[in-house]
Amino acid sequence: MDSQGPIILEKSIKIEEVIKIANTSIIDIVTKTVTPEIKAPYELVDVEYDKMGSDYILSILVDKEGGITVEDTSDLTNIISPLLDTIDPDPFPNQYMLEVSSPGLERPLKTADSLKAAVGSYINVSLYQAIDKVKVFQGDLLAFDGETLTIDYLDKTRHKIVNIPYQVVAKVRMAVKL
């Protein structure tokens, strides 16, 4: 502090935004650390770091052709856990539980390649910006050309087609058709 007193920030940041930024940094660091060590036949699908109740959970979602077994998750945990201990400086502000698991039926689709592979599948798409006043679409992915997702969805009782620019997509995951 100088003789003029404390500096007051003019722009306030919500604590939730700070936590989200910190979590993104942790996810990036963990992803860079574990990706080279998850070798074929396994595929790293996603890394998530969230607070559940009073606990922090680091989830590493891994898959392989035909699905992963409990033994696979155990083997991968034995590879990943020591790797996380080598990260310096330690990015984790609190103790956490490591969870290595399958992405399940509603697996996230994080890359353009995973979206191309999902053409013909039933998906859920969340948007940063609404299209026709809608921010979440659920339907069949008809096409993805790297720039636009084309989805056939049900609006009440009528099928509609929507073209969604990839840059407004916040999150995409597989969905279960009921």
UniProtKB/Swiss-Prot annotation:
GO terms of biological process kind: ribosomal small subunit assembly; translation
CDD domains, sorted: YlxS_C
Cell compartments where the protein resides: Cytoplasm
InterPro entries xref list: Ribosome_maturation_RimP, RimP_C, RimP_C_sf, RimP_N, RimP_N_sf
GO cellular component, one term: cytosol
Family: Belongs to the RimP family.
Identification of the protein by name: Ribosome maturation factor RimP
Organism field: Streptococcus pyogenes serotype M5 (strain Manfredo)
